[in-house]
Amino acid sequence: MKKYIVALDQGTTSSRAIIFDKEQNIIGVSQKEFNQIYPREGWVEHDPMEIWATQYSVLQEVMAKCNITQENIAAIGITNQRETTIVWDKNTGVPIYNAIVWQCRRTADICDDLKERDGLVDYIRENTGLVLDAYFSGTKIKWILDNVEGAREKAEKGELLFGTVDSWLVWKLTNGKVHVTDYTNASRTMIFNIKNLEWDERMLKELDIPRSMLPEVKNSSEIYGYANLGAKGGIRVPIAGIAGDQQAALFGQAAFNKGDVKNTYGTGCFLLMNTGEELVKSKSGLLTTIAIGLHGKVQYALEGSVFVGGAVIQWLRDELRIISDSSDTEYFATKVEDNGGVYVVPAFVGLGAPYWDMYARGTIVGLTRGTNRNHIIRASLESIAYQTRDVLEAMINDVGYDINCIKVDGGASRNNFLMQFQSDLVGKKVIKPIITETTALGAAYLAGLAVGYWSDKEEIAKLWFASEEFEPNISEERRNKYYKKWKKAIERSKEWAIED
């Protein structure tokens, strides 16, 4: 049997390639950052060719670094930033515009117009599981077709293709032979029906998107096509797993059972609860999404997306310049007994779940003459935990049962102050896995299952072990007192950007 699986992890700020062996040991990692493009306030773009160049180069680099040839790779799995939208020319393979990133708010006006259409908000919620928001791919596709010269005409002639980042990478890896996505990524577009598992005709009509642009939707674990990683005529490696980053992390955490919850602390924060084969409609502002698609069947999940999680730490470092390194936050946060009454609401691009307020903006409240740098840093870290509690409360309200623990991963999960505060604030155990690269691991698992590298989910579940556990150690009364103040701070940030 071939020895290794390669996971391509295409994220919001960097492209990574990670090689795993059968015992899920990490053999090698390569990573390259790429440019963030901000053409106007609230707009965020990436260059699709730079995404591809960085992703392919880290793949080559990690193989060379570990002295591994393609003969030893059983399969490639792909996980990606979701919702980010790329439209390219079918014949030349050249993108007609930059990738519009999930964080980008440029289509807020389109969303406002769509909200006026009879019954559309409810239809979207009922059939796509999503809320009508600029976050998702549908309105981004419409914007490109409406604003790039000649785009709509080319699309009508069947000359343009749309894809989320996974589709783009598969297209490039297979030299334009394969145009696919998986159920998890499709479920984030706002044009995919999560009940009948097909592109939704009404949504395509409402957004005026030709069906010919869309990729074929496949399972999250199957062979989609082959990549040639060496010289022409060399051994072809199967591309055999695809999942959006948050669903991949859920799978990588072995959260296979109904009621399992994970939170990924990345640029944003993403809480997912596996609801099994039950499609739970949220009453609390959460998304209903597809957790995974295997063997033509799907498991569903409830998701709460927090737009600014770890990004608040980047803001402290890059814009306020009150820390020089992200890891400094833990040190400074513990230099004060508490937040000094200061609350930071990092609604830089609006508020995600459960509020869905595109016009909210960041606020710092509770400042006094005695407030110092440490209070601001601590309150910024705490904001990540508060937003997580907002989402967790909504989830428990929707499903009608409690949970025992949260499995955590992502960059900010390395911050022990934050993890302890998180446990204190929600009153649940917080568990870190030994392998924290759960997103890449999920993609590796999916690819490995498709080619028989791992036999089944049961084998994978036995590989999952906890590295650290955090138990709550504050009273219920104190927990609720903190949270009440947070809710007050949230109210201050809402609807700030609405013009009077």
Curated annotation (Swiss-Prot):
Sn-glycerol 3-phosphate binds at T12, R82, E83, Y135, D245. Pfam families: FGGY_C (PF02782), FGGY_N (PF00370). GO terms for cellular component: cytosol. Gene3D superfamilies: 3.30.420.40. The keyword Transmembrane does not apply. ATP binds at T12, T13, S14, T267, G310, Q314, G411. One of its GO terms (molecular function) is ATP binding. Disulfide bonds: none annotated. Homotetramer and homodimer (in equilibrium). This is Glycerol kinase. The lineage of its organism: Bacteria, Bacillati, Bacillota, Clostridia, Eubacteriales. The gene is glpK.
